[in-house]
């Protein structure tokens, strides 16, 4: 089985968002399935970055939110991979930022050190964890540094302005859209929001409600990312390996 991440800038049409039966892929001779999967996933991420950040017209996107429709959907790993690809392709500083704290174990699993979740003082960039020459990871604790309670539009607007001064691009791991208004508010204050759907579990009704929530908040929906998508490689291909 293989997993892909794709951007669909169009309305969803299926009761269950599952494109697994629509795609088949081949494996080049002499390559393992794991090697092909890794290259394919990397290509998907790079295409996603080019669609969102690099066209530069009518104006370049600098702050983009990735928010799930359902709780439990893995968004952090997508954001980190998008940030890594963006740092490779873009000429500027990039940051992957959580908007709310998560468990330390989850951060460490994505390749960030414990140093990044310790509260520090100074500029936001100084408090973030530098992952490469132009890529930083900002934990939820650092993002909300000096703030307590629910995010207000006034505080959030000021924090986003700080980030624009310190980073050329910021990829946000946003809250669940169906949870409250925080995701829609964040998307409205940023350049837009990408909905993250789990291919085999997100239902059409939940996705439609999420889109309505964003529309009511005047939050720009940039597209839909389909994650956790699996599809079979034909048996005839396996027989040639």
Identify the function of each model-found stretch:
Residues 79, 107-116, 209-212, 236-241:
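Short, aromatic/basic amphipathic alpha-helical patches
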Residues 1-53, 208-241:
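C-terminal lobe/tail of nucleotide-utilizing enzymes
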Residues 51-55, 84-85, 162, 213:
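A generic secondary-structure signal
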Residues 21-46, 50, 57-62, 67-73, ...:
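P-loop/Walker-type NTP enzyme "switch/lid" segment
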Residues 149-241:
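Conserved catalytic-core segment of NTP-binding enzymes
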Residues 76-97:
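A conserved segment at the C-terminal end of the G1
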């Amino acid at each position: 089985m293989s997993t892909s991440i794709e951007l669909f800038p169009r309305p969803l049409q299926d009761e269950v968002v599952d494109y697994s039966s629509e795609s088949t892929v081949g494996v080049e001779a002499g390559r393992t399935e794991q090697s092909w999967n890794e290259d394919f996933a990397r290509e998907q991420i790079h295409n996603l970055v080019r669609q969102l950040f690099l066209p530069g017209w009518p104006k370049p996107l600098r702050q983009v939110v990735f928010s799930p429709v359902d709780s439990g959907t893995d968004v952090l790993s997508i954001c980190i991979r998008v940030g890594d690809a963006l740092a490779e392709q873009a000429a500027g500083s990039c940051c992957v930022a959580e908007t709310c704290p998560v468990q330390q174990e989850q951060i460490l699993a994505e390749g960030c050190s414990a140093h990044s979740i310790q509260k520090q003082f100074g500029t936001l960039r100084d408090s973030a964890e530098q992952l490469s020459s132009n890529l930083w990871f900002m934990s939820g604790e650092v993002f909300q540094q000096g703030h307590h309670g629910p995010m207000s539009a006034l505080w959030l607007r000021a924090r986003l302005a700080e980030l624009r001064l310190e980073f050329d691009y910021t990829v946000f791991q946003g809250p669940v859209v169906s949870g409250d208004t925080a995701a829609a508010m964040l998307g409205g204050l940023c350049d837009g929001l990408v909905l993250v759907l789990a291919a085999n579990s997100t239902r059409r009704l939940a996705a439609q409600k999420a889109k309505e929530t964003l529309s009511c908040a005047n939050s720009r929906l940039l597209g839909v990312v389909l994650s956790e998508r699996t599809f079979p490689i034909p048996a005839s291909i396996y027989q040639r390996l």
